[in-house]
Amino acid sequence: MKLTDYVKQVSLEDFCRPFIHHVQWNRRLRSTGGRFFPKDGHLDFNPKVYQELGLDVFRKIVRHELCHYHLYFQGKGYQHKDRDFKELLKAVDGLRFVPSLPNSNSKPIKLYRCQSCQQTYQRKRRIDTRRYRCGLCRGKLLLINQPED
C-alpha cells in the first residue's frame, strides 16, 4: 500500500475526515516520527520509524500528524501546547512522543579516570591524555575502557 493511500485510510477510519494533501517519506528526519507543514498542508514521515518500530507505532504517529492537520484546517489549536490538540490526540490514541530508535550513529562512551583522585570522566570523543589533566586535582588521566570501533 502506498503511503498516501495509507494516510487517507487512517484519516477516514480514525477521524472520519478526508485527507486531501500530499504525503512523503523524509529520510532526513532524525528525532521525530513525522512533520506537518501548515503552509501547504503536506506531511512528512520518517521511514526508519516504520522500518524499525513496525506498523502499530507508525499508525499512532500518523494519527499524531493528522491531529495537527485536521485541527489546523478546522481553525482550532493545532500545536502541542493547545488543549484541542491534546484532547484529540488522546481520543484517537496517538503517540505524544516517538519511542527512541536504535541509533547506529551513536559513538561508544570512553571512560577516563584520574590516577590521583579517582575522578571518572565519560566522553564520546577521545582525550589526549598527554595534554589534558584532571579538572579537580590536575592528576594524570588514564583510559579505562577501550570500546570496539
From Swiss-Prot:
The prosthetic group or cofactor this protein requires is: Zn(2+)
A GO molecular-function term, please?
A: zinc ion binding
Q: Where is the active site?
A: 65
Q: What is its main location?
A: cytoplasm
Q: Which UniProt keywords apply?
A: Cytoplasm, Metal-binding, Zinc
CC cofactor note: Binds 1 zinc ion.
SMART domains given for it?
Answer: SprT
Q: Does the keyword Cell wall biogenesis/degradation apply?
A: no
- Which residues of this UniProt protein bind Zn(2+)? 64, 68
Q: GO cellular component annotations, sorted alphabetically?
A: cytoplasm
List, for all copies, the residue spans of the domain called SprT-like. Answer: 6-143
- Similarity-based family: Belongs to the SprT family.
Protein name per Swiss-Prot or TrEMBL: Protein SprT-like
Protein species of origin: Streptococcus pneumoniae (strain 70585)
